[in-house]
Swiss-Prot record:
Ranges for region G5 motif: 235-238
Gene name of the record: Dnm1
Protein name in the entry: Dynamin-1
Enzyme Commission designation: 3.6.5.5
Organism: Mus musculus (Mouse)
Annotated segments matching region G4 motif: 205-208
Amino acid sequence: MGNRGMEDLIPLVNRLQDAFSAIGQNADLDLPQIAVVGGQSAGKSSVLENFVGRDFLPRGSGIVTRRPLVLQLVNSTTEYAEFLHCKGKKFTDFEEVRLEIEAETDRVTGTNKGISPVPINLRVYSPHVLNLTLVDLPGMTKVPVGDQPPDIEFQIRDMLMQFVTKENCLILAVSPANSDLANSDALKIAKEVDPQGQRTIGVITKLDLMDEGTDARDVLENKLLPLRRGYIGVVNRSQKDIDGKKDITAALAAERKFFLSHPSYRHLADRMGTPYLQKVLNQQLTNHIRDTLPGLRNKLQSQLLSIEKEVDEYKNFRPDDPARKTKALLQMVQQFAVDFEKRIEGSGDQIDTYELSGGARINRIFHERFPFELVKMEFDEKELRREISYAIKNIHGIRTGLFTPDMAFETIVKKQVKKIREPCLKCVDMVISELISTVRQCTKKLQQYPRLREEMERIVTTHIREREGRTKEQVMLLIDIELAYMNTNHEDFIGFANAQQRSNQMNKKKTSGNQDEILVIRKGWLTINNIGIMKGGSKEYWFVLTAENLSWYKDDEEKEKKYMLSVDNLKLRDVEKGFMSSKHIFALFNTEQRNVYKDYRQLELACETQEEVDSWKASFLRAGVYPERVGDKEKASETEENGSDSFMHSMDPQLERQVETIRNLVDSYMAIVNKTVRDLMPKTIMHLMINNTKEFIFSELLANLYSCGDQNTLMEESAEQAQRRDEMLRMYHALKEALSIIGDINTTTVSTPMPPPVDDSWLQVQSVPAGRRSPTSSPTPQRRAPAVPPARPGSRGPAPGPPPAGSALGGAPPVPSRPGASPDPFGPPPQVPSRPNRAPPGVPSLGAWRLNSPQGKHENRAGKARL
């Protein structure tokens, strides 16, 4: 390793894993570890048991590992195990460890083969292990059993992906030697998440269970199916050995004997077996941790910074002792009052750019929604004239009137003024709704104190409801005042003498087309929604609304005018949204049943939000475009059908002049009333409702809270908030401790360099067999080339039968190469004769293809020269 500090890297990661496992998944740290993946019954758990030297993992048929097991091996003088979920309890009997794993698995997954991604953390202290951190994962399977869901294959795959996709996770791909390696589930998933092979280590199990005459030598030499980090072979205990109580110490000795005695593996014996695998994994994991420490430190620091902000908020709002609760309550009430005032009055700091504040919404109600509601009550022209004619006739009675009666004017005006009550009361209701919404927005900061938040909302809302009655009484009083006296001497009232003149002036204005003053009321983007697909579909244009017309342009530069529409005889109506449309639509139509735009009876205009629609409607009101009344069509049809009630055909010229005079007078006086109401309503609501509520919050809210009872009850935190605060504080301290520990580690040691890349394109080929079972790499001896006998002999001697064609040495015995001169990089030390550079003609380990190839002929000539 180079220094003691580097040897402590793996225990450091173990401590980090324990710390962050204890506080839950919120840490989301990519800690360095080794994930053991493989198919079902590939021998993953047996490899881990060999590491520990004890039987401690559940065994059986089918899927046995049903939850991830985070196994932390720690080199120690004493031997025992600890579970994270059983803190303080030491397990010295490893049979109890097995039972605890099974019991903990069943607690989460059930007893009938269910799986769960929640890991079990097990730490094993032993003098027989090296420092390692491994994760034993469920074996990949295809067919569900027991109560497993039909998608068990994908659930297990998703669980594996949670571990192996992390860049800091080494992948221990376990594959049995007695199955096709190219179809290995472990290597497939490793290739998918680690295409460069930088994190994958291959392990070949069940070498002793291969068919007689076959071996996996070329695979273990990393020649046939190469991996960048290579392969390591191990021999686990068979089920017979386990049933016979063969301990792992004896199994490791048998494994060592197997590699030393097997003719295909003895030259690799020093690089095979469980002890060597454990050593390699320790070295690789340590180097991997060293390489990933800088990134881990940066991630810890960034998480610490984000947590510090939240922890500071908890410090500001968390009273830890009863003496501070009163002070904290006072601070929160003051903060609530300030927030409420800022949302109503507006503020230059911390401006919300995503939605309108309460004050801005109330402003829209005062100056857009309320005027629109007033005009929606606009009287129908024909109905109004009919009512005026009836009033004049009824006032005259049996007599024929010579003058226009002013009582008809007063009767009609009072009837119209009474209609204003409904929009005024609706305006109060809308403002109250916005005030209550603003109160709830301001109390969001108190969500960690649910009792205080609930009580504060109740007190303020109750006060608003109390002021609602007082405000509505005052509004009704304003309407009654208007009804009490008709001020026909008002400076804005045209009077009887000017009524006829005004009618004549309006007619002249229409004919002359007054172009001297054109007031632009509104500009903005709108979408024409009802253009057919054949004509281009819906398009967005820049609209300009004036008192005379509505124009739209290609863009907001207003250079290319598309169309101009006069606002005379136009009205508004709402249009329902389409099935797939998210826009809000309103339409313009002509009251004289004419086409509005080209061959369209109505012009449908679309906005992104309902607020924009309301704002445009208010702008159209200023231009004299009023909304369609619900009963317009019905009343018009009734009037046409009822000929006796139609005054259009029965009015004499004198009555018609009188009706027109009264009509102008009513129009003039109602304009004065509407102007007065539009001016007084915001003032009344501000004085009686909004300002009064602000004053109540500043002066009386705290006293009302104190009168509710025990302040300690009000200041009780919610269980969820207390738990979250405790979790964040634990994580905060864990992150600080982790950064402190990492800062003390010396990471200057030179690690083993990464092996060079290899050609691993074989992983994409599904027909390559598992190991070097035969010279032709066939999975079964029956598929050998016909020129070579099918079975491998038990020794390195010549095989029976005639020598293959092209053999230069015939049946000569094998000639060992000189010590130290072998080109085989996997050979043993020089004092032991290395593997022959060339094979006798009957040895199928090299194959007839090598002897027939130019390379084989070159080796034959080299052998003759040495002889």
